[in-house]
Amino acid sequence: EAVWNLTVVFLQMWEASAFEKEHIDYLRYKKLPDKAGDTYCQVIADGPAFNPNNSIESVYNQMITFADEYLYITTPYLVLEDYMQQSLIEAVHRGVDVRILTPYIPDKKYAKLLTNYNYGILLREGIRIYEYTPGFIHAKQILSENAAIVGTINMDYRSFYLHYENGVWMSGKKIQEDIRQDFAYLFETCEEISYESWKHRPRRWKLIQPILNLFSTLF
């Protein structure tokens, strides 16, 4: 069923972006699965056409809010709205092990500066932040003891409000354990950032970052 939902999302985008309007027979592409899996999946898709009611943003915030044990996030861009930042801080204050993994090597320098700027208050409040040092990492996933989401969704304003994004919300013992093992491997290959080291970042970064942050919704 999840595969069919992803197919529908693709066909809808194809239909919307076509230069010439065409009617697509969706059912033509529906294939019956050989067998059902043991993971419950729900496809979530969103975009500017749905503003201000953004389902992806709501699901992410709910995952953060309802986490009780751990919350692991991988994102190439960490540019948070105040309410999302506060949700993460409240999670760590109630005893949740909150960890965020970002790339050490960026694909965009300004994104690196903005991501690093967002570290400060999170580190100060007890959230653990890791940078993937072997290379650039572009994975986007969030995992708690309750569920996981893997998709195209960055933790930034553009993903939640300006871009068309999709992901798969999953709940199942095996898939969650597989993703958790993947996180465990990634944490071992990363460098953990401390609040003290963040405070001693390059002086030029400290000068540029507040200015960039004023225009963060444009990047």
Residue spans for each PLM region:
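Charged, low-complexity intrinsically disordered terminal segments
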Residues: 1-219
